[in-house]
Regions:
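Membrane-proximal helix-turn-helix segments that form the acceptor-binding/catalytic region
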Residues: 21-25, 38, 50-91, 106-115
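Conserved donor-binding/catalytic core segment of Leloir-type glycosyltransferases
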Residues: 140-158, 164-168
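A short helix/loop element that forms part of the nucleotide-sugar donor recognition site in Leloir-type
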Residues: 126-139
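Short aromatic-enriched loop/helix-cap "lid" or pocket-rim segments at secondary-structure transitions
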Residues: 19, 42-47, 52, 105, ...
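Carbohydrate-associated surface elements
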Residues: 97, 119
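Short N-terminal targeting/anchoring amphipathic segment
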Residues: 2-15, 29-35
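Generic beta-sheet signal
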Residues: 33-34, 94, 116
Length: 173
């Protein structure tokens, strides 16, 4: 029997809002670690420039052909409002930025939000001698190296513009 129920990323059909209601009415304390904005918005994983979630989601600018006053974002926002009233949820974010966004959400009014950054194994991920590192990974010595990783480089949040700018600066030198 669980003492605490700890939710993480529950989207893509893993848990429905009805499933979450069942969890909240179980009588167990619930901690929900947020990995995106979905818990604090109507339907967005990342709200971009939209601040509707701070009052009430509706007329969603990201719904194909535009949303309406009672679009999916509105209906889901209302369902979450009701859902979150069933029992206290302690929300945890993995970044200060996400905590700030969550705290401005009308859905989180009076809710507890804590930031706990993702842990890094500092025994494994630590600085090492540059020459040894380049030799280990067969990288050339005396050359500038640029590393960039992204699942989708067309997503501006991932910083591809900075990569392009850095490459241009390096090419000029």
């Amino acid at each position: 029997q669980a003492d605490v129920i700890h939710l993480h990323w529950i989207n893509q059909g893993m848990l429905s809002l009805n499933d979450i209601r069942k969890i909240l009415t179980s009588g167990k304390p619930v901690v929900w670690t947020m990995h995106d904005m979905w818990p604090c918005t109507g339907i967005c994983h990342y709200a971009r420039e939209c601040n509707n979630y701070q009052q009430e989601c509706h007329d969603c600018p990201y719904i194909y052909k535009g949303g309406g006053r009672k679009d999916l974002s509105y209906r889901t926002f209302r369902k979450k409002q009701k859902l979150y009233s069933y029992a206290p949820i302690h929300f945890v974010t993995c970044s200060h930025w996400l905590k700030e966004q969550a705290q401005t959400s009308a859905l989180f009014e009076g809710k507890s939000v804590t930031n706990i950054p993702n842990a890094i194994n500092t025994n494994l991920f630590k600085p090492m001698n540059k020459k040894e590192a380049r030799a280990k990974f067969m990288l050339p010595e005396g050359k500038k190296l640029v590393l960039f990783g992204s699942l989708k480089i067309t997503d501006k949040r991932k910083g591809v513009d900075y990569l392009i700018g850095a490459c241009k600066l390096l090419a000029e030198k």
